[in-house]
């Protein structure tokens, strides 16, 4: 009896440590959103010019997720996690030391390499290490780590950047990663590769129209979100005319609302996943359309950010759950593709926001984001009517 209790505790401790790792990886991806103005000032650049760093990072992840996953498909997972954390930590040290914007971008590419592998294996590892009958809760913990990156990681990173300089933000993330690495070394057993798939899995996955439709929906809706979200910090300060402290509070509010979205999806996702995702996309569309009109009031922007955060968390969870349900025989390949496609959307959205800000007006980022958001809404309605059972019932 005691052995079972201890083993369950250890199993949960392993999953929690993975969730902390997810928090750290997501924090470092999102945190530049809150530091763009400071980094731009440091290198005497325009904020929109620095924003291209977001696109480069995201597209490196998109490009390398599948190749790296296939290259490491037979590598024992504990060893793989240790190696990618070493690369992650070293890259953050370089970010801290970066003496030019080019060096900063190079350091971020190193982080992106580690990111590409991490997110292709994390969901399946959490499921493997979860106590018996607790797979859904394990995935929920990983999702919570992701949500907390928005709730705590991004705002805390911005606060550290405001008071101690943006370099210290990256250094602090590196220290957090080092502590997490030591915990992983202590806790994780040997984890031989399982269900990782191979190149042979790709034609099989590509022949699943429901899965391909989810991938397409993902890239379009993420593009819509990041067209505006990538530049929300300079938008709040330069377009709305509010303080840097309010920009920090708004990021905290938007991220915190994601936890509400996670709770809603946790309660209703099993029965109404498709309806929830479509409703969330419609809510995102409304938020983007109202971004500029809401910029005349801190209260209006605050309320809008709550609904925006709820919508994006439901969308993100819904997409991940459906991908895992539609590819149980090749989870690592499917999640590597998902991570790559998600990051194509991040990069595309950041690039669109960059071009709108440079060549038109940053005030228009919300309106421009409504175009892919509307397309995503129509596509979600079409595919969820076309495959209502396939998407909902394969988890049973």
From Swiss-Prot:
Q: Which UniProt keywords apply?
A: Cell inner membrane, Cell membrane, Membrane, Sugar transport, Transmembrane, Transmembrane helix, Transport
User: Could you list which ranges are Cytoplasmic topological domains?
Assistant: 1-14, 71-80, 124-135, 191-208, 267-274, 320-332, 385-396
Localization (cell): Cell inner membrane
**Does the record bear Cell membrane in its keywords?**
yes
Q: Which PROSITE patterns match?
A: MFS
List the Periplasmic topological domains.
36-49, 102, 157-169, 230-245, 296-298, 354-363
What is the superkingdom listed in this entry's lineage? Bacteria
User: Which terms in the GO cellular component ontology are assigned?
Assistant: plasma membrane
One Gene Ontology MF term: carbohydrate transmembrane transporter activity
Query: Which positions form S-S bridges?
Result: none
Where do the TM regions start and end? 15-35, 50-70, 81-101, 103-123, 136-156, 170-190, 209-229, 246-266, 275-295, 299-319, 333-353, 364-384
**Membrane topology, from the record:** Multi-pass membrane protein
One matching Pfam family: MFS_1
* Presence of the UniProt keyword Transport in the record: yes
Q: Which family does it belong to?
A: Belongs to the major facilitator superfamily. SotB (TC 2.A.1.2) family.
Function as written in the Swiss-Prot or TrEMBL entry: Involved in the efflux of sugars. The physiological role may be the reduction of the intracellular concentration of toxic sugars or sugar metabolites.
Q: Per its record, how is this protein called by name?
A: Probable sugar efflux transporter
